[in-house]
From Swiss-Prot:
Protein's UniProt name: Acetyl-CoA acetyltransferase
Gene3D superfamilies: 3.40.47.10
GO BP annotations listed: ergosterol biosynthetic process; farnesyl diphosphate biosynthetic process, mevalonate pathway
Known EC number: 2.3.1.9
Catalytic activity: 2 acetyl-CoA = acetoacetyl-CoA + CoA
Name of the gene: erg10
Amino acid sequence: MVNTEVYIVSAVRTPMGSFGGSFASLPATKLGSIAIKGALERVNIKPSDVDEVFMGNVVSANLGQNPARQCALGAGLPRSIVCTTVNKVCASGMKATILGAQTIMTGNAEIVVAGGTESMSNAPYYAPKNRFGAKYGNVELVDGLLRDGLSDAYDGLPMGNAAELCAEEHSIDRASQDAFAISSYKRAQNAQATKAFEQEIVPVEVPVGRGKPNKLVTEDEEPKNLNEDKLKSVRAVFKSNGTVTAANASTLNDGASALVLMSAAKVKELGLKPLAKIIGWGEAAQDPERFTTSPSLAIPKALKHAGIEASQVDYYEINEAFSVVAVANTKILGLDPERVNINGGGVAMGHPLGSSGSRIICTLAYILAQKDAKIGVAAVCNGGGGASSIVIERV
């Protein structure tokens, strides 16, 4: 078995569009194509040089067969390209990256594109009783986004109920969650103001129609929407007298991200300067209703796999499905909050489900470069009780 080192030679993401916002007219497959094309162009790699593509996507209904392949062909990759769509809910993009790394490590590929894409704005409604005709009574529409993206498959409850359970079990009050959310927004706003995201973002042209020029979207839409007074006063959503609100949870969004992974031999052959090396990963799972704290189980596994001590880690990216997720996992692992999500996260920037896992790897790689740091850990929880984590090293 081959066991080559795997490098990230390119990492990009689209801006994240608000729900029903600038990207509402673009399907997830189009956003994915833009990310893949942008990632390849950054390092001047020909589409025909790519061996395989893994792309995460969660709500695939109405997108057509194998969204990953549509993303690849839309980016100009040849029809011979092997493509796999990955659905591990919010961890899909990270799992796609892990699969890509494993494919290279086993000698089955030298160049892999991995990432994820989601258009939550375009998630359809289902009419499940209409296949053979409703026999009697009213016909209901089922929200595909809620059913397949944001609800527990086992008890049918929204993900926010699990967030409330997390807050209760780990004694995290409303004020702490609101404070974290405000911090996330301010960090994201600062990152935009200082152009910290500039390197990782590939702009997206959106057709406007009626003879008007296309609109060029270059930054995330959500961070500017902070209203501190409103955030602190909005009512809890999932539980009477609860602590989780629409304002301290992640938003619904559209976006995509893509990484170009490469074997050590191919990096040397092409004379490229990688962004980072993938040195380990780990995954974990527990009760579905406790998925919120699964990153605290996956991160130690990833560190062990990488042969890294927690004290060696410079920065963390823990996906902010809810403020309570980042707060709880930071608390459980005893992390320094000043080294977690330093440019904001899903609460302020957005959480397009299939993309977030690879998006945080992308962001982390640039943080390591900007901060002249060495080791970074990214982790993301996923519905059903799981989490994935990955360790990267700047080279």
